[in-house]
Amino acid sequence: GIIFIDDGAAKALSNGKSLLAAGVLKIKGSFDKGENVLIVDKDENHLARGLASFNSKEIDKIKGKQSKEIENTLGYFSKSEIIHKDNMVKL
């Protein structure tokens, strides 16, 4: 799968930060929690790969939302990061 992120999230990733839902624009493809996904900017430049903390359906529901909104949107709290910095490698 592919996760498209905004410019703010791209800058955060370049500074070694985790990917949060607020920076996600859209997803492409279907994937499960724990799968290796590609992170791209809006121009489809490859930025990083990482292990997703949520499946593609969950990310589609929480994309663009603040971390505090995740629990209300999904009905449970998991993690605040879409991909934690420790589970990501920059390309």
What do the PLM-derived regions correspond to, one by one?
Residues I2-I5, A9-L91:
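Beta-strand/loop-dominated core regions that host nucleotide or nucleotide-derived cofactor-binding catalytic loops
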